[in-house]
Amino acid sequence: MNWISNVVPPKVRSFLRRETPENLWVKCPESGELVFHKDLEANLFVVPGSGYHMRLSPKARLANLFDEGIYEDLPTPEAPVDPLKFRDVKRYTDRLKEYRAKTEAQDCVKLAAGRLEGMEIVAAIQDFDFLAGSLGMAAGEAIITGMTTALNRRAPFIIFTASGGARMQEGIFSLMQMPRTTIAVQRLREANLPYIVVLTNPTTGGVTASYAMLGDIHIAEPGAVIGFAGPRVIEQTIRERLPEGFQRAEYLESHGMIDMVVQRQDMRATLARLCSILTRTPRASEAA
C-alpha cells in the first residue's frame, strides 16, 4: 500500500477506479479513425469520415428496415444438431453452445415479417458473428421457411447475406442446403414474387454459389467483399495478379455482376421503391 492509499478517501478511490466502457470508442479498420460509439450507432455503424460500413446486428438492421421498427419475429423449425458428431479442436456442439450464448440466437439466420412503407414484406438476416454466418442445416431450414412464408403471404422476400460459406462441421448436409434453397428461390419466381438480395460484407463461398446470386435484384453495401474463393486461392490457381478492388462491391457493379451499390442510410428507401415497382403497390409516402 502506498501513501496515496492512505491520503485519498475510500469514496474518491472508488470513483478513480471507475473504468471507461470498453466500447466507448471504436476504431475504423480502414482509416484508423476513432469514433464515439453512440455517434457510430446513430449513423447505422457507418464511419462518418471514411464511409466504412461496419457490421450491423440483425436486430439493428431489422429495426431500421421496418416501419417504426415494428416487426414480427418468425419462428424457424428445429434442425438436427451435429449429425456427423464432428470434432476439431473442440466439439461442434460446444461451438454451437458458445455462439448461442454470445449472440443470443439459435443459429445465424433471423426471420421477420412486417411493413416497409406500408407494404408487407418478409425478411431474413444472416449474422456473421454466429460461426461466420455459415450455411448449415438450421440456416437452410430458416431461409426456406422465410421464402415459404413469403409465398403464403404473397409478399416480397428480402435477404441480407453475410457468410463465409458452407458450414464445414456439417459436411454434405451443409452442401445440401445449396440446391434446397435454390429450389425455394424458384418457387418464389414461379409465384411472381420479388426476391431481393442485399449483399453485405462478406458474402462468399457456397452462399454466393446459391441463393445469394439468384435474386431478381442484387444490391450491395459499399466495399462489401463478394465472391466464391478468396483472392489468394484464385491467384495461385490462375498464376496471375488480380485487378485492384477485385471482389469488392464497386468492382462487381462496374462489371455487371450486381445491380447497384447502396449506402446503408439509403437502403430502406431503395428497398421500398423496388418493392413498390415490382409489386405495383404504392408506398405509404406516395399515397400520402
UniProtKB/Swiss-Prot annotation:
Instruction: Return the similarity comment.
Output: Belongs to the AccD/PCCB family.
User: Where does it primarily localize?
Assistant: cytoplasm
Name the species this protein comes from: Methylocella silvestris (strain DSM 15510 / CIP 108128 / LMG 27833 / NCIMB 13906 / BL2)
Q: Gene Ontology terms, cellular component aspect?
A: acetate CoA-transferase complex
- List the disulfide bonds in this chain: none
Biological process according to GO = fatty acid biosynthetic process; malonyl-CoA biosynthetic process
Location in or out of the cell: Cytoplasm
Put simply, this protein is called Acetyl-coenzyme A carboxylase carboxyl transferase subunit beta
State the InterPro entries in the record.
Answer: AcCoA_carboxyl_beta (IPR034733), Acetyl_CoA_COase_Trfase_b_su (IPR000438), ClpP/crotonase-like_dom_sf (IPR029045), COA_CT_N (IPR011762)
- By its UniProt entry, which Pfam families does this protein fall under? Carboxyl_trans
